[in-house]
Amino acid sequence: MDCLFCKIANGEIPSNKVYEDEKILAFRDIAPQADVHVLVIPKEHVASSANDVNAENCEIVGYIFAKIPEIAKLCGVDSYRIINNCGDKAGQTVKHIHFHVLSGDNLSERLV
């Protein structure tokens, strides 16, 4: 599969890892939109959140949300924004489900 995030998850492409376990990987965004901007991805390929999350793979979304507070703490923050861009018109550029975790003094009303 020619998926950027799959290649990052399996180590073909290096990343600045924040957290990793057997199910997920969290790494710093290469073009951060806030002081803290981390991407959290499942290691298993799930194409997007709108059309491809189903009964067989939906538990990974809950798992990611359960781990985000721990990931945020590792980044030194206790308040943050979680964003999921779903589809081309929403700005999704990598077709592998992922969540942006953002925090910082200059975040205010901005969106990714």
Feature map (PLM): residue ranges:
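HIT superfamily nucleotide-processing domains
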Residues: M1-V112
